[in-house]
Amino acid sequence: MTSPQTSSLDDIFGSSPPHEDEKFSQRPSIQAPEPSDLPSLRRQHVTAGYRDGVSAAKGEHVQHGFDAGFPIGAQLGMRAGTVIGIIEGLLRGFENRTASRAVKKPLQWKEEGQGTEADEAEAARQAKREQLLRLYQKAVKELEVRSVFAGSEEGSTRDNEGQEKPEVVLRRKGDAVISQWEEQVRVAQWEENMAALEPKEDEQRASTSTEQI
């Protein structure tokens, strides 16, 4: 007969045979087989959830980008259009003046020394027109939307490390480009002149309508 002391030591050092309950607990658990269609259903649900999440997030961010970016683009576009419109108006003015002079001048025989001043004035006018044409072509190229915002995304990532909002970077980039052209074309002076001419045009329309009545 084994003494209680020996039995307790056997339990500590593992020399005693395992108990029945220990044998039962060490048996590997047998999992129930998973239905064959369950993995396929799981993949379908994961895919559907992923697509819904992408659609919801994309729609939200697209709308936010539109709300934040559209006013900036519209404002800068109006400023760029003003610059191009002023140059184009000047260019058309030179073209119309040259065409009217060509129609009004009859073909005449010129004596030696005559017409020198007129020829010089016409040459200066043509040179001015060519200068305006080059300026117009340059403005159209540099104020194109891709040129205005070129490098704004790279600059935001490199310099600000994403701390500034994209629309803020776009506004600053576009303003820097367009402001240079506004100073070169003197847009502020043109707007003042146009504002001064508007009341006169309104008075002329009012007087014309009164005379017709």
Curated annotation (Swiss-Prot):
Top-level division of the source organism's lineage: Eukaryota
Entry annotated with the keyword Nucleus: yes
Residue ranges, annotated region (Disordered): 1-42, 194-213
Entry annotated with the keyword Cytoplasm: yes
Location in or out of the cell: Cytoplasm; Nucleus
Swiss-Prot/TrEMBL GO biological process terms: protein maturation
Family matches, as PANTHER family: PROTEIN YAE1 HOMOLOG
Protein name: Protein yae1
Gene: yae1
